[in-house]
Design a protein with these regions (language model features):
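Small/polar-residue-rich segments within soluble enzyme cores
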Residues: 1-40, 78, 259
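A generic alpha-helix structural signal
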Residues: 7, 55-56, 201, 262
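Conserved, well-ordered alpha-helix/loop/beta-strand core segments that scaffold catalytic motifs
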Residues: 25-65, 69
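Beta-lactam-recognizing serine transpeptidase/beta-lactamase-like catalytic domain environment
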Residues: 22-32, 72-123, 128-266
């Protein structure tokens, strides 16, 4: 389980042994072959114990996930999934009732929410959408857009609301990020289209495992035309693209993916 399970072979090393000849009384007569043991390798963690303990105390009694990384090298300084469970009963073999209780707990303590919790990334993706649109030439730093309270999908009567009921007024990309203006990113998503969105947002690690050295990790979903057809047997609609523009709709990600995307941006 966890980090020890991932590095079991490296930590365990190799067991040594001897092949000997014995007499009819079981006494060793001579040594035929000897293979000395090889010690396991040392493992140095990046975790900050005090930071880990502090976050655990803050999250006590809550359902939440927190992961803190060093943006310089991606090292994990703290990782907390709450509520958690006591791993000690698993060492000697946990009883049926105790294990059943953990499985049926509605707070799902056996799930590592950092690597297995799947959530819409929501407005956290707006900086990545902006950078992608800038890089693709869809917008420039000087592009302006009037952020009304709603945005209408061209050619339809379908309206999408902004979180700010009064709207944001005239926006450029910087102000749109600062104010988390939904309508600006509806327009950006519409102009980019789902194919380019999928291509660019994949560069930030969405829809794929992060490579963290833990076995329990979900890849999440960065939706595409092919994904929707394969999973839902339905075509992709423009309205689907608009929701993706603000990190909603079919898009789901883990907290560790979200923090990796941020370190990629930094």
């Amino acid at each position: 389980q966890g980090i020890e399970g991932y590095y079991e072979k490296a930590l365990h090393g190799t067991t040594g042994y001897q092949e000997v000849e014995v007499d009819n009384h079981g006494r060793v007569v001579r040594l035929l072959k000897e293979v000395p043991p090889v010690a396991g390798k040392n493992l140095y963690l990046t975790l900050d114990l005090h930071l880990q303990q502090y976050i655990e105390s803050v999250l006590k009694g809550q359902r939440a996930a927190v992961v803190v990384v060093d943006p310089r090298d991606g090292g994990v300084l703290a990782m907390v999934s709450s509520p958690s469970y006591d791993p000690n009963p698993f060492v000697k073999g946990i009883g049926y009732q105790a294990y059943k209780s953990l499985l049926e707990n509605p707070d799902r303590p056996l799930i590592n929410r950092v690597t297995q919790g799947l959530y819409p990334p929501a407005s956290t993706v707006k900086p990545y959408m902006a950078l992608s649109a800038l890089s693709a030439g869809v917008i420039t730093p000087n592009t302006t857009f009037f952020g009304a309270p709603t945005w209408t999908l061209p050619g339809t009567q379908r309206r999408y609301r902004d979180w700010l009921k009064t709207g944001h007024g005239m926006l450029n990309v910087t102000k749109a990020i600062e104010e988390s203006a939904d309508t600006f990113f509806y327009q950006v998503a519409f102009e980019m289209g789902i194919d380019r969105i999928h291509e660019w947002l994949s560069k930030f690690g969405y829809g794929q495992s992060t490579g963290i050295d833990l076995n329990e990790e979900y890849a999440g979903v960065l939706p595409s035309r092919e994904w929707k057809q394969r999973v839902h047997k339905k075509p992709w609609y423009q309205g689907d693209t608009i929701s993706v523009g603000i990190g909603q709709g079919y898009w789901i990600a883990t907290p560790i993916q979200m923090v990796k995307a941020l370190t990629t941006l930094l």
